[in-house]
Amino acid sequence: MAMLPKFFLVLLCLGLCSCSQKTTTIEGEQMTIFYRIVLGTSLSAKEKASLSQQIDRCFHKIDSIYNNWNPYSELSIINRAPADVPITLSVELSEFLDQVDTLYKLSEGRFDPTVGPLKTLWLLHLKSQTLPPKDVWEQHYKDMGWQHLEFQSNTKTLIKKNPHVQIDLCGVVKGYAVDCLNEICNTFCPNNYVEWGGEIKTSGHHPSGRPWRIFSEAAGTILDIDDMAIATSGNHIQKWCVEGKIYTHILDTRTGKPLELSSYPIQSVSVVHPSCAYADAIATVLMTFDSKIEAKQWAEEHHILTYINDGASS
């Protein structure tokens, strides 16, 4: 679950608040990714210890179920399973894959959580300033695809129709974790802010009484984010020049190749939505459109609030 660079500046300004504005801040690192939680109240030592324990349990659940980098996670066990054998899923993973299936269908396959091995292959070569052999990446491309999985939400089972297909939920699980953490925080204080790896969700308002404010580079301005989540995808940092072309870390599932800047002009996308998991996935989906106009039209058709920066058009 490697951290992707995000383009947010959170304007909490807590250090400038008056002494009457009590807050509780908990921050740390989980799975190599920094997290920060701010509550608009001063918790007692007992309450803070309880909150910290629940936060740890949330991250443990994420690691033990959804983390494909953990060889003992439920997801890793599924990835090692043979084809054509029904796999019984936990309630948590089954419900999550139901959301994933919805996102896959909504995006018409642009969001596909089986792209992981192909992406790893491309990044390994791009970081070495080379391109993978065509026959190698094309074989990886044939092995990926949500269509190679038979998921039954009613029976909570999954069957791999292709033994090589792998599930990688990195493109959505950070947002899901933020949703879970936000639910926990709401039981302690209705005004809170949660961030993990650049994915953000807020409830209520800032301790000063104003809205929570976040600067989004995709929007080019400060946004008021109350009782909503915001996620951003962008190509500013993770890109490589190979054989005269600039490639990014995002793959187009329609071609099996990473986005090449001359063909994909969108630089960053922010999505605002009640679900951080949803915003997380859709932000990446919108990066794969051929133009800002097309991406904006698709988002509007699906009633999704987005901010898209292509460095040119308004």
UniProtKB/Swiss-Prot annotation:
The gene is apbE. It is a lipid-anchor. Belongs to the ApbE family. Pfam families: ApbE. It comes from the Bacteria. A lipid is attached at C19 (S-diacylglycerol cysteine). A lipid is attached at C19 (N-palmitoyl cysteine). Its cofactor is Mg(2+). One of its GO terms (cellular component) is plasma membrane. Transmembrane segments: none annotated. It is found in: Cell inner membrane. Mg(2+) binds at G171, D280, T284. It catalyses: L-threonyl-[protein] + FAD = FMN-L-threonyl-[protein] + AMP + H(+). Coiled coil: none annotated. This is FAD:protein FMN transferase. One of its GO terms (molecular function) is metal ion binding. Gene3D superfamilies: ApbE-like domains (3.10.520.10). Residues 1-18 form the signal peptide. Flavin transferase that catalyzes the transfer of the FMN moiety of FAD and its covalent binding to the hydroxyl group of a threonine residue in a target flavoprotein such as NqrB and NqrC, two subunits of the NQR complex. Keywords: Cell inner membrane, Cell membrane, FAD, Flavoprotein, Lipoprotein, Magnesium, Membrane, Metal-binding, Palmitate, Signal, Transferase. Its EC number is 2.7.1.180. It comes from Chlamydia pneumoniae (Chlamydophila pneumoniae). FAD binds at M31, W69, R110, F111, D112, D168, K174, L251.
